[in-house]
Amino acid sequence: PAAVSVDCSEYPKPACTMEYRPVCGSDNITYGNKCNFCNAVVKSNGTLTLSHFGKC
């Protein structure tokens, strides 16, 4: 199966919406939405990756 990914090129953003569309990171943490996840990816210098869509 192809690896799942999200495009984080527009991030980081100073604020994220409260929209709840959970994604599961490679750190086994559930992020509330793509914005929160992508901000964390940038903060991790790209070491954090997407595990799957939905809660961990």
UniProtKB/Swiss-Prot annotation:
Main location (coarse class): secreted
Cellular component, GO, one term: extracellular region
UniProt site (Reactive bond 3): M18, E19
Keywords linked to the UniProt accession: Disulfide bond, Glycoprotein, Protease inhibitor, Repeat, Secreted, Serine protease inhibitor
Keyword Secreted in record: yes
SMART domains named among the record's database cross-references: KAZAL
Protein name in UniProt: Ovomucoid
Organism annotation: Pternistis erckelii (Erckel's francolin)
